[in-house]
């Protein structure tokens, strides 16, 4: 039986979403993706219902006084407190810290499965964008069992809450649309997941 993880569109959508959450919109990784989302062609290639995507596509193209790089800086870098921090341990750790117990559990799981994933800097591996990029890499390399575990154990337990807060506080139509696109896409993945999603308490 072919699972959704084995379809090409899973790896593509995971990589697109991961890059847009992880890299600056001006970077060579994401600049072409940003331009693609400002056109209508992408909707036909995204594995979701066209009716659900239509309002998202409109929002991507909505004008904002704040530039996209400024919005990305505010949402993902600082210097002020991030409205919806993109690291799992901030949501899963009682103290809402980086490099919390959930990050250590992810590292242990990666070691046990022989997974090496280079981060840009000395930052936690449980960044929402980097986990999506890792899921894409696992799917592309035929490691579908590990990909399912990554989603069920290390991403889905906190991603819905993160995306809800991210959308509410994005403050920029492009990133609000990106959050909605991610929420719709991940909900579809979770509905098709074979193994159960781990139930973990959230502290934000």
From Swiss-Prot:
Family, similarity comment: Belongs to the TorD/DmsD family. DmsD subfamily.
The species this protein was found in: Salmonella paratyphi A (strain ATCC 9150 / SARB42)
Stored InterPro entries: DmsD-type (IPR026269), DmsD_chaperone (IPR028611), DMSO/NO3_reduct_chaperone (IPR020945), TorD-like_sf (IPR036411), TorD/DmsD_chaperones (IPR050289)
HAMAP family (alphabetical): DmsD_chaperone
GO MF term list: signal sequence binding
SUPFAM superfamilies referenced in this protein's UniProt entry, alphabetically: TorD-like (SSF89155)
Annotated disulfide bonds: none
Gene this chain is encoded by: dmsD
Pfam family, one: Nitrate_red_del
Sorted UniProt keywords: Chaperone
Function: Required for biogenesis/assembly of DMSO reductase, but not for the interaction of the DmsA signal peptide with the Tat system. May be part of a chaperone cascade complex that facilitates a folding-maturation pathway for the substrate protein.
Protein known as: Tat proofreading chaperone DmsD
An example Gene Ontology biological process: chaperone-mediated protein folding
